[in-house]
Amino acid sequence: TFGQLLEYNGDPIEAFYYSTSDGHGTDGSVWGADASNTPYLRAVTINNKAKKLDLTSNEAFESFIKDENTDAYDSDFPMFRWNTKTTSTILDEKIGGVGRITGLTITSRGAGGYAKTLKVVGTEGSKTFSGQSRIRSILGNVSLVYNRKDGFTSTGWDTLPSGFIYIENNGTDENQVTTF
């Protein structure tokens, strides 16, 4: 792309890049902006079909992200489908004021399914966090191990690799530590 300029209606665009998608793009609202300011960013599948899917419900997004056979430009990339586990103990380092964390829920999703708001429930209250960057930061931790599509793992990141996530509650152990 050296020496090339992307334009929309004759004007240079503000271009955003990422190494790997989840198979579906999003609009400019992912950065907290009004999507109409970046009409060239569209929430469509990342393939030749450019199909628009409604991934704004947790059920629809989870079904999409669990599909290992999604047809996408980068579906063979190592981070196309990744997963990790975290615990209430790890999350307590960044989230205070709710007691022992017992639940995490994505309460709203943006175009393409990115996590827009996160509700954290604890034994002494709850908090809601907004913005995919903030959510990625809150849930990320350098100690997490990311299982990649290629069978290898990655570590050392203090934020989640993407805001295109779903969360499963995997239960609480005898020490009252909840795993997600």
Model-derived features: positions:
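Conserved, single-site charged/polar hotspot
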Residues: 1-180
